[in-house]
Design a protein with these regions (language model features):
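Kelch-like beta-propeller repeat domains
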Residues: 1-195
């Protein structure tokens, strides 16, 4: 079966607890960011339209993180003209096929999102408007819907990867910094950065 719509790139694909995959937003063949969402069922090889984000929330280069309670947390991103979101983040509930607005993380796109062992999501780095790189991090807590600041990535970076280590620290690798591609990894402690 084929993906509905015009296809997508710069989207997210998140494995749900029931084995299906939620695909959210991205850029279509017309070079326009979308608000669409679809669910792929690998057991049946079928696609089903899911509730879309509000049209004003169409985006690409965002993150989508599966939470321990089965919801998906969608944060940040930008539109095709480079406008970086500064509004709410979003929670998708697959049991009700619905979206709920959550607290803003400020302007952040091309960032990383790492689920912590305590259920919070660490959002790190990325970029803000006018191409300004972001060094800061923030925690989203799904238990109460709040966002709290974390430490800084050194140097600021976008397009990097972030992996939770058994110690609770996060390894950031690669990405782009002010001088181009970064070759040095960083072990990031959620409240402080260490080289």
């Amino acid at each position: 079966d084929q993906m509905p719509g015009q296809g997508a790139r710069h989207h997210t694909a998140t494995l749900l607890q029931d084995g299906r995959v939620l695909v959210v937003a991205g850029m279509d063949n017309g070079e326009i960011a979308t608000a669409n969402a679809s669910i792929y069922d690998p057991a049946a090889n079928t696609w089903t339209p899911a509730a879309a984000l509000p049209l004003a929330e169409r985006r690409m280069f965002h993150t989508a993180t599966l939470l321990p309670d089965g919801r998906v947390y969608v944060a940040g991103g930008e539109q095709e003209d480079g406008t970086v979101f500064n509004g709410p983040t979003w929670l998708y509930d697959p049991t009700t096929n619905s979206w709920t607005a959550a607290a803003s993380i400020g302007q952040r796109t091309r960032h990383s999102a790492t689920l912590q062992t305590d259920g919070r999501v660490l959002l790190g780095g990325g970029r803000a408007s006018a191409g300004v790189l972001v060094a800061s991090s923030a925690f989203f807590d799904p238990a109460d819907g709040t966002v709290a600041p974390g430490g800084n990535l050194i140097p600021a970076r976008e397009w990097h990867t972030a992996t939770l280590l058994p110690t609770g620290q996060v390894l950031t690798v690669g990405g782009r910094g002010a001088g181009g591609s970064l070759t040095s990894p960083q072990i990031f402690t959620p409240t402080a950065a260490i080289s």
